[in-house]
Amino acid sequence: MVLRAVCGLALLGPALAAPAGAAVTPAATTAAAAGTTVAGNVRYELIGRWDVAKLNQILTSDSPKFFGVSVAYTPARNAVKLYRVTYASVIPEQGNRPITATGLLAVPETGATAFPLLSYQHGTVYGKQQVPSFPDQSPETALAIAQFAGQGYLLIGADYFGMGVSSEPEGYMVKASHQQATYDMLMASRAVLAHMKLTAPKLFIGGWSQGGFVTMAFLEKLESAGVPVTAAATASAPVDVMATLSGFLDFPRKNDADWISTLFILSSFSFENYYRVPGLARALLTPEYYDVARKAYERQPFNPADVPTDLHKLLRPEYFDAQFFAGSAYGRLLADTQAYRWVIKSPVRNYFGETDEAITPGIGQLAMTYQRAMGSGNMAVEAVSTGNTSHRGTYATAVPQWKRWFDSK
């Protein structure tokens, strides 16, 4: 039984079942399952094929049911082949320690050889396999595949470090690692596409919630590396994690989600592991709930009912003092976890919901406000309201708007 949700996906409980009509067709041959190696350290394997009927089932039935809103999506026109890509990467926070990561590549079956490419960055999930390269367990990825790959876009998505088939601990909201995972996934995917004799002249990037933050951080890295980005779009993006989390402590709202406690759990243990700050999570969490929080982060067996939804039970009382929070080791790391404080050059649209239970309208508009605050203002970033939408509803409503905007580029 799924007990709560992060980014609308399973948080505490078993992995979600595949959406109806969206199950992955197993790879047909042993050779396909074994995979193909390209560029020395990049491997890809066929994991399934979704036909037009399945893609349209996702758009017309599965997604409205899961996200809780009825949205008019553009019907799928073509089937899609799905591949898991395995690639070499490094952890920047640990002296570029080498690791292996995974992600998804979705290829439209149209007979064409050139396609626009969307890199989709997924939101927060509890299950290690509720990520792009296990698309039958990821309703948000399924929606992106159906709307974009089913309409002739190549689609890629990194699983992030510690997710998918990775043996690493989760690197939740660890900025440089998210940048590395997505950048290396793009490079690996381009190697796979070259092997398939396919090209992608236009690059789009998009993501929801945590994935919205990752999308903006990815954009920062791409612009720094001189990689052209045709356009970037997010939904419910916490572009300033310190402002987002401190808001739950200092200015709680009546509609704040009951799964917010998990954001503190995942980030504190991830920061402790990736930034190598022993005792960071223990300093933040109350002794009564430290052990169950650690088990939740490490995906060990535990009773989900033991994780409190009341932040006053989970967090030590001194963290509700804004000055203490900001000056703590955890707070200082959070203050550096932002993805909007540079002069953005690429066209960006940040979609936000007026009644989102996790991301306030102020956070949703923050990147635009910052860019326009500089002198005469940088107009590259636009914040777009999706109306009175929930966290899930904001993403579901934004996706077809992303599509129309990307198509115009």
PLM-predicted stretches and their roles:
Residues A22-T113:
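Catalytic-loop region of hydrolases
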Residues N56, P238-R341:
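Accessory cap/linker subdomain of secreted extracellular hydrolases
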Residues E93-T102, A106-Q151:
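Short, surface-exposed "cap/lid" segments of acyl-processing enzymes
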Residues Y172-A194:
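Alpha/beta-hydrolase active-site loop
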Residues Q323-T337, R349, A358, Q365-K409:
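C-terminal catalytic histidine-bearing segment of alpha/beta-hydrolase fold enzymes
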Residues I344, R349-D356:
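Short beta-strand/loop motif that positions the catalytic acidic residue
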